[in-house]
Regions:
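Condensing-enzyme catalytic core of the thiolase-fold
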Residues: 217-220
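Active-site-adjacent loop/helix segments that line or gate small-molecule/cofactor pockets in enzymes
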Residues: 11-50, 189
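PLP-dependent aspartate aminotransferase-fold enzymes
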Residues: 109-215
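Short, Lys/Arg-enriched N-terminal segments with co-localized hydrophobic residues
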Residues: 1-9
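Short, hydrophobic/aliphatic alpha-helical segments
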Residues: 16-24, 55-62, 112-113
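Glycine-rich loop-to-alpha-helix module at the N-terminal edge of alpha/beta enzyme cores
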Residues: 63-144, 148
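Active-site and channel-lining beta-strand-loop segments
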Residues: 45-66
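Generic structural signal for well-ordered, non-membrane alpha-helical segments
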Residues: 14-18, 22, 49, 80, ...
């Protein structure tokens, strides 16, 4: 949960209201937030009041430039009138259904036209779910359970991807580095399927694929 915001007003800011709200919230929400990534510390966690385009404002009135973009979905910025209008039109026809609509096909066609390798498109509600499905498809197609992750990558919060490795202390002569779960409650057996390779190390990736090609079914 590294902070990725730039405070516009570089003078010392006050987050008194956020601190007060945090003291209430921790009695109802774990860590006072709805995701561990939103927790910055007992005295540093802030709460948003409103946002527009690339700026957010906390409940103390501090303004920030936001580089997180809600972890991706708000690439066009907050309160973009085009997106908001499309959302309103979607609500007018009923919102979300347990059935398909014609628009799904139209959007899938647009995606395939922009990404020609995406011959078929399946939508998901989150990146976590998309990665879970991708791993499942990879296993089903390759008949292999093993998969590779790149050090420092983020693939959501399912048990399959909550793994890391200390590459600073790793000596390639000692074999593959031991992977460690990044959260309590992750079954250790899952780690037997995971291989992590350093970022931007094509040689190491090639070595792993040559060595474990009979085990690896998916590369994230």
């Amino acid at each position: 949960h590294k902070r990725k915001f730039l405070v516009l007003n570089m003078t010392k800011r006050s987050i008194k209201k956020s601190n007060q709200h945090f003291q209430k919230a921790i009695h109802q929400l774990p860590l006072g937030v709805t995701s561990n990534f939103r927790y910055w510390g007992d005295e540093e966690t802030i709460y948003v009041d409103r946002a527009s385009r690339c700026r957010i404002q906390d409940i103390d009135g501090n303004e920030y430039i936001d580089y997180r973009l809600a972890y991706g979905p708000y690439i066009l910025g907050y309160a973009d009138p085009r997106v908001d209008q499309a959302a309103r039109e979607g609500m007018d026809i009923g919102g979300v259904f347990a059935l398909s609509t014609e628009l799904e096909y139209e959007v899938a066609q647009m995606i395939s036209s922009m990404v020609p390798s995406a011959e078929l498109v399946r939508f998901s509600n989150s990146g976590t779910e998309a990665v879970m499905a991708a791993l499942r498809v990879g296993r089903a197609y390759s008949k292999r359970d093993g998969y590779i992750m790149i050090e420092g990558g983020y693939h959501g919060v399912s048990d399959s991807v909550l793994w890391d490795v200390d590459l600073d202390e790793w000596d390639p002569k000692q074999g593959d580095p031991k992977v460690q779960p990044t959260s309590h409650g992750v079954p250790s057996r899952i780690g037997e399927m995971v291989t992590l390779v350093p970022m931007n190390d094509a040689d190491r990736l090639e070595d792993v694929l040559k060595k474990k090609h009979n085990e690896i079914g998916t590369l994230l």
